[in-house]
Amino acid sequence: MRVTDFSFELPESLIAHYPMPERSSCRLLSLDGPTGALTHGTFTDLLDKLNPGDLLVFNNTRVIPARLFGRKASGGKIEVLVERMLDDKRIFAHIRASKAPKPGAELLLGDDESINATMTARHGALFEVEFNDQRSVLDILNSIGHMPLPPYIDRPDEDADRELYQTVYSEKPGAVAAPTAGLHFDEPLLEKLRAKGVEMAFVTLHVGAGTFQPVRVDTIEDHIMHSEYAEVPQDVVDAVLAAKARGNRVIAVGTTSVRSLESAAQAAKNDLIEPFFDDTQIFIYPGFQYKVVDALVTNFHLPESTLIMLVSAFAGYQHTMNAYKAAVEEKYRFFSYGDAMFITYNPQAINERVGE
């Protein structure tokens, strides 16, 4: 399978730079996995598509203000993008600079360069940075950090992004990108879903900056997936098994929820799914055997990205590419602040040949 098999033409004008005024007012393209049939509507139509007893699984990670600006004490501007908080004082980060800092280099961070930090070690593409400050990493980031908007949102971050680029149920700080399918859920919609009898559960996957890295190989089987930390606690496992037992569906809100659930299923030894607290490098592309997820709420993804590959493995390659072609023709809004899809699983997708 070639990366170019997942390419499609996308006019620049369809990339959303701001969200809709109301979270749940975006458009919704529904794709019936088995048949490929498409239905156009609005996000609140989800209420009619879910049944009492269905289980929605959300990712409750919270985006941290992970982008820092400053300079090396020796001179030279730098941009730091936190990949992971290691503890209260240390981070793994990507550092953009004309010349990469060496271990021991002193960094002056923040618009007023008031925060002192030291680059202590390098681990491949990542730099280990230690803050020389009384405050915790999270407090420092909340004080001087910028929201890490994706590279395709071509504007500086604004104060409003601190809430707009968060789900309303975000709880555990640690992500450097939002699980964007969840951005469309507001409290009124969540309340209506609960009133209908739809069950809800929460996994945690701290989305890393690697989610925006392009696939740099020609053959997708050669791609090495970035690592992210995920938690699937016992209460989620119980909710999944109970939903399956009563004949209801497990509906993942976002690809990060998919990756969390399917990672927990892959690692399970005795049951369909078991608790999971670990890093995951799961790479889902056509040919993957889904074990847990029956339906998916997701945004529109970048051409040639690992996420459009995940969707193709779920709905079928041809159905997915046809849906994206229709979305472009109908001028849906793309990417993080864009519109959404509701997709049901296509059990025949695993047998489909791509690029032959």
UniProtKB/Swiss-Prot annotation:
Keywords: Cytoplasm, Queuosine biosynthesis, S-adenosyl-L-methionine, Transferase. Its EC number is 2.4.99.17. It comes from the Bacteria. It catalyses: 7-aminomethyl-7-carbaguanosine(34) in tRNA + S-adenosyl-L-methionine = epoxyqueuosine(34) in tRNA + adenine + L-methionine + 2 H(+). One of its GO terms (molecular function) is S-adenosylmethionine:tRNA ribosyltransferase-isomerase activity. GO terms for biological process: queuosine biosynthetic process; tRNA wobble guanine modification. Pathway: tRNA modification; tRNA-queuosine biosynthesis. Pfam families: Queuosine_synth. It is found in: Cytoplasm. It is an enzyme of class 2 (transferase). One of its GO terms (cellular component) is cytoplasm. Gene3D superfamilies: QueA-like. NCBIfam families: PRK00147.1, queA. Transfers and isomerizes the ribose moiety from AdoMet to the 7-aminomethyl group of 7-deazaguanine (preQ1-tRNA) to give epoxyqueuosine (oQ-tRNA). Belongs to the QueA family. Monomer. This is S-adenosylmethionine:tRNA ribosyltransferase-isomerase. The lineage of its organism: Bacteria, Pseudomonadati, Pseudomonadota, Gammaproteobacteria, Enterobacterales. The gene is queA.
